[in-house]
UniProtKB/Swiss-Prot annotation:
Function text: Histone demethylase that specifically demethylates 'Lys-9' and 'Lys-36' residues of histone H3, thereby playing a central role in histone code. Does not demethylate histone H3 'Lys-4', H3 'Lys-27' nor H4 'Lys-20'. Demethylates trimethylated H3 'Lys-9' and H3 'Lys-36' residue, while it has no activity on mono- and dimethylated residues. Demethylation of Lys residue generates formaldehyde and succinate. Participates in transcriptional repression of ASCL2 and E2F-responsive promoters via the recruitment of histone deacetylases and NCOR1, respectively.
Residues recorded as bearing Phosphoserine in the entry: S523
Domain of life: Eukaryota
Species of provenance: Homo sapiens
Site (Histone H3K4me3 binding) residue list: D945, W967, Y973
Effect of G138A: Abolishes histone demethylase activity
Residue ranges of domain JmjN in the record: 14-56
One Gene Ontology cellular component: fibrillar center
Family, per entry: Belongs to the JHDM3 histone demethylase family.
Name the UniProt record assigns to this protein: Lysine-specific demethylase 4A
Keywords, ordered alphabetically: Acetylation, Chromatin regulator, Dioxygenase, Host-virus interaction, Iron, Isopeptide bond, Metal-binding, Nucleus, Oxidoreductase, Phosphoprotein, Repeat, Transcription, Transcription regulation, Ubl conjugation, Zinc, Zinc-finger
Length: 1064
């Protein structure tokens, strides 16, 4: 029968229907009809109502309707992959919204055909964020309209309200959406994979993209491949409605899709598990809600829900299974109802429209539920649920994650503009002869707000001006010390997709960056350097480009050469010309290749990795004295004492280190970079990681922690292969150990073919007998290395975490091209090893939070426990330094100290401030956890809150038992009992004699580090017998003394509010 159903709309194209008025009257029957025609296979269908039907006579009287929470949609990304962030704005009326939507800034651009408008949408998606009046509770239907009234569709979804008295806004109540040009809805399926209906009341059209339900898993795999960080945090992250993928990307990866434009006065129907996305052409108003048929029940039972937020919509399927699948109810409750969904089959209600041979198989004793029988839906067999005693309760359909961003921070600062078009960029060749211009203080402009890309959205070709009269002169040491220098800090912005320069004038002591003076260049055009994605075309040798504002200045990143220890030197005219030629040649090569991978090339002569070996005769080799060696006190660094690269090679120490790491989860030297993240976020490792000593070294299989995108991502290029050749079907990979150096890796992480995974396997370095070679990107030995440029070697983990490093052969994870790493990365100083080494070496990464300048080598950060986790494309790894660690996670990670009676602690007083107090006694209280019928939960109910039975006398209900809960608002709600939790409570007494009973989470010991929120409200009682200390409503805090800015640096001053917003 399935084969016959596949003949219905076999191409899974979006179908359009034109019902007559008679057909249009019965909504549920017409939905069954369009499914009998195969409309559900596309995941989306259009229905054009009869011309004589109108839901409302006029829309002239809605101007005063209030949009309570408009959202501004900020989009970041490039090359067809985007993330949408929603920022909540203040309430406005429809009149105000229309005025904004039709203004010159937000109005629809001119276009001749839809394809042109579609190109403009995807090209300008990240510019000029629009405002969306979404999720407005209400309807524009007139009360007398019964046909297709979105407020009362009378489908089986009404059972949710009839059985439990629960209404969920936007799910079984209508929502209004006021759109403008470029407002978007990201790729998603409906909550609980329900059907949805969308009617466009008036205004400009709305474009839709749809992926057939039978190909939905392929779209999910593609999204997880490009956004592994989001996928690890939440299995159903697409339900967050933040992911936009262009049709070109879908076509590129062979995912079937279709598109359609909805005009005013037309309906769109989405079907279960039908992924859809789209955008508005201009000012319009739409209304939508969800509904269900009997076919949806199986989808609802198997829907994968968002696990990271408790406020996501969740509907109990109990009532639906009992009513419509009674013979499968017990099996389903036991978790054994494993039905495979056939997306091609129409709903059972479509039987009357199908021939006998096309009828879908009936599931047992399912009975029809015609629309006219809905009033008596409660009257079922013996096992039917009783109607809840609870009154109506309003839930909320959580559509979008909104960010609160201070108004002081400009949007261009938070989300830099990036040109996403396919325009070609040409650079005129630099002249060989450059006239001298002496570096001065004014040749360097200070930039505190970050450099943004010039806006080239309206141009078809961009040419960089020829640099004239540019030269670097040699300066003696006195002149270098006298001149002001540019202190560069390079930060991979966590949202913007680029690195940001922030400059500061030279001070007596620099917190970051090289301690030497920098060279400066003057020119006719001011320049900056966007150091963004992997393989974008930079060789990291010389980078010259133009600011949006031209004021006649140029800065050039120079290679790290050394003069007398760590001092930098200037370029000669001939050297600069050679470097420029090499850079221009690399640009031409990259332009010809159009993103295709190129074989490893030799590093340029002035590359820092080349210069590191060119140590002058008067430079002594770096050695630590015995006194310095004995100063090691930090616990994380003690096991590494023999592994620093400034010490003599010690292969036995490396081997011992590798053996130790092999015994620790996740047992892979490459996956180790995500070790801290998994321990903190998931409370350790699952059983798949196991104990390495339990199984034979060559037989153990575990699941790698590193997503494939971390190896394949090339930043701005999306030409990547998301296949994993050495992974098993269950996602695990075999662990192999080198017989010589004992390093242990996953075959997939290191690129070991299954045929070579034997007990005699040797890593690449041992196979090449390069036992004294070290990683050129960090300062530690040990771990898994692969070959890089010029016979150098790099840690695979270092290559993964450094955005611009590139695996040439992705399957084999080698060789690694490090030539595209920008020069300023090599100038960063690692906060962990700068005290342990006399000179800077290797290449650092930085904290991903805002503009945090904290820098560290990948291997140092991993050893010190810095949290690194997979990030979303185009980034690879998201790094959180110790300064930005979440306090709650830090406190939860370590076991809380036990507290005894009589102990002095710090806790929150009833006046809202924290004081020192004494623990009087310890008690144990029992709290109940329940799941409410609307999907919400509570884990701190008192036994007396359960009103359906006397829990104080008879104890807690059985797990899964339906109970009635009296909430704090005095209403009674239906819920299911989950568990009872005995919690240790502490009765504390403050110095004023007042006592409180608090949980352990609300108590801090005197030797415990207090969170910032506690420190800010910490007070000490005075000696005045506490008069009015504990009773006053607000305790005034001592004001921080205002800092006076030196007039010399007044132009460099940042407003405190802006600084706090940036750092947050």
């Amino acid at each position: 029968m399935a084969s016959e159903s596949e003949t219905l709309n076999p191409s899974a194209r979006i179908m359009t229907f034109y019902p007559t008025m008679e057909e249009f009257r019965n909504f549920s029957r017409y939905i069954a009809y369009i499914e009998s025609q195969g409309a559900h296979r596309a995941g989306l269908a259009k229905v054009v109502p009869p011309k004589e039907w109108k839901p409302r006579a006029s829309y002239d009287d809605i101007d005063d309707l209030v949009i309570p929470a408009p959202i501004q949609q900020l989009v970041t990304g490039q090359s067809g992959l985007f993330t949408q962030y929603n920022i909540q704005k203040k309430a406005m009326t429809v009149r105000e919204f229309r005025k904004i939507a039709n203004s010159d800034k937000y109005c629809t651009p001119r276009y001749s055909e839809f394809e042109e408008l579609e190109r403009k949408y995807w090209k300008n998606l990240t510019f000029n964020p629009p405002i969306y009046g979404a999720d407005v509770n209400g309807t524009l239907y007139e009360k007398h309209v019964d046909e297709w009234n979105i407020g009362r569709l009378r489908t089986i979804l009404d059972l949710v309200e009839k059985e439990s008295g629960i209404t969920i806004e936007g799910v079984n109540t209508p929502y209004l959406y006021f759109g403008m040009w470029k407002t978007s809805f990201a790729w998603h399926t409906e909550d609980m994979d329900l059907y949805s209906i969308n009617y466009l009341h008036f205004g400009e059209p709305k474009s839709w993209y749809s992926v057939p339900p039978e190909h939905g898993k392929r779209l999910e795999r593609l999204a997880k491949g490009f956004f592994p960080g989001s996928a690890q945090s939440c299995e159903a992250f697409l339900r967050h409605k933040m992911t936009l993928i262009s049709p070109l990307m879908l076509k590129k990866y062979g995912i079937p899709f279709d598109k359609v434009t909805q005009e005013a006065g037309e309906f769109m129907i989405t079907f279960p598990y039908g992924y859809h996305a789209g955008f508005n052409h201009g000012f319009n108003c739409a209304e939508s809600t969800n509904f269900a048929t009997r076919r949806w029940i199986e989808y609802g039972k198997q829907a994968v829900l968002c696990s990271c937020r408790k406020d996501m919509v969740k509907i109990s399927m109990d009532v639906f299974v009992r009513k419509f699948q009674p013979e499968r109810y017990k099996l389903w409750k036991a978790g054994k109802d494993n039905t495979v969904i056939d997306h091609t089959l129409p709903t059972p209600e479509a039987a009357e429209f199908l021939k006998e041979s096309e009828l879908p198989p009936r599931a047992g004793n399912e009975e029809e539920c015609p629309e006219e029988d809905m009033e008596g839906v409660e009257d079922g067999e013996e096992g039917d649920l009783k109607t809840s005693l609870a009154k109506h309760r309003i839930g909320t359909k959580r559509h979008r994650v909104c960010l609160e961003i201070p108004q002081e921070v400009s949007q261009s600062e938070l989300f830099p503009k990036e040109d996403l078009s396919s325009e070609q960029y040409e650079m005129t060749e630099c002249p060989a002869a450059l006239a001298p211009v002496r570096p001065t203080h004014s040749s360097v402009r200070q930039v505190e707000d970050g450099l943004t890309f010039p806006d080239y959205s309206d141009s078809t070709e961009v040419k960089f001006e020829e640099l004239k009269n540019v030269k670097l002169e040699e300066e003696d040491e006195e002149e270098e010390q006298a001149a002001a220098a540019l202190d560069l800090s390079v930060n991979p912005a966590s949202v913007g997709g680029r690195l940001v320069f922030s400059g500061s004038k030279k001070k007596s002591s620099s917190s970051l960056g090289s301690g030497s003076s920098r060279d400066s260049i003057s020119s006719d055009s001011e320049t900056s350097e966007p150091l963004s994605c992997r393989a974008q075309g930079q060789t990291g040798v010389l980078t010259v480009h133009s600011y949006a504002k031209g004021d006649g200045r140029v800065t050039v990143g120079e290679p790290c050469t050394r003069k007398k220890g760590s001092a930098a030197r200037s370029f000669s005219e001939r050297e600069l010309a050679e470097v420029a030629d090499e850079y221009m040649f690399s640009l031409e090569e990259n332009k010809k290749s159009k993103g295709r991978r190129q074989p490893l090339s030799k590093l340029p002569r002035h590359h820092p990795l080349v210069l590191q070996e060119c140590v002058s005769d008067d430079e002594t080799s770096e050695q630590l004295t015995p006194e310095e060696e004995a100063e090691e006190t930090e616990a994380w660094a003690k096991p590494l004492s023999q592994l620093w690269q400034n010490r003599p090679p010690n292969f036995e120490a490396e081997k011992e280190f590798n053996e130790t790491m092999a015994q620790q989860a996740p047992h892979c030297a490459v996956c180790m970079i995500f070790q801290t993240y998994h321990q903190v976020e998931f409370g350790g490792f699952n059983q798949n990681c196991g104990n390495a000593s339990d199984l034979a070294p060559q037989k153990q299989r575990t699941k790698p922690l590193i997503p494939e995108m971390c190896f394949t991502s090339t930043g701005c290029s999306t030409d990547i292969n998301l296949s994993t050749p050495y992974l098993e079907e269950d996602g695990t990979s075999i662990l192999v150990s080198c017989k010589k150096c004992s390093v242990r890796v996953h075959a997939s992480c290191y690129g070991v073919p299954p045929a070579k995974a034997s007990e005699d396997w040797m890593c690449s370095r041992c196979s090449a007998n390069a036992l004294e070679e070290d990683c050129c990107l960090c300062s530690l030995r040990g771990g898994a290395l692969q070959r890089a440029n010029d016979d150098r070697w790099v840690h695979v983990s270092c290559a993964v975490a450094i955005l611009e490093a590139r695996f040439v052969n992705i399957a084999e994870r080698s060789p690694v091209d490090v030539s595209k790493i920008p020069l300023p990365r090599f100038k960063l100083k690692c906060i962990f090893c700068k005290k342990r080494r006399k000179r800077t070496a290797g290449c650092c990464v930085q904290c991903s939070h805002g503009r945090c300048p904290t820098a560290f080598h990948v291997s140092c950060a991993q050893a010190a426990g810095v949290m690194m986790q997979p990030d979303d494309w185009p980034f690879v790894v998201f790094i959180t330094c110790f300064r930005h660690k979440i306090p709650n996670l830090e406190r939860a990670k370590g076991a809380l100290q036990s507290i005894t009676a009589g102990q002095k602690v710090i806790s929150k007083h009833k006046n809202g401030r924290f004081y020192q107090c004494e623990v009087v006694r310890l008690t144990t209280e029992t709290f109940y956890e329940v799941n409410f019928d609307d999907g919400s939960f509570s884990d701190n109910l008192y036994p007396e809150d359960i009103v359906s039975q006397d829990c104080l006398q008879f104890g807690p209900p059985a797990e899964g038992e339906v109970v009635q809960v009296r909430w704090t608002d005095g209403q009674v709600y239906g819920a299911k009992f989950v568990a009872s939790h005995p919690i240790q409570m502490y009765q504390v007494e403050f110095e004023d004699g007042s006592q409180l009973v608090v949980k352990r989470d609300d108590v801090y010991t005197l030797d415990e580090e207090l969170p910032k929120r506690v420190k800010s409200r910490l007070s000490v009682a005075s000696d005045m017998r506490f008069n009015e200390i504990f009773t006053e409503k607000e305790v005034k805090q001592e004001k921080k003394r205002q800092r006076v800015i030196n007039s010399r640096y007044r132009e460099d001053y940042i407003e405190p509010a802006l600084y706090r917003a940036i750092m947050e």
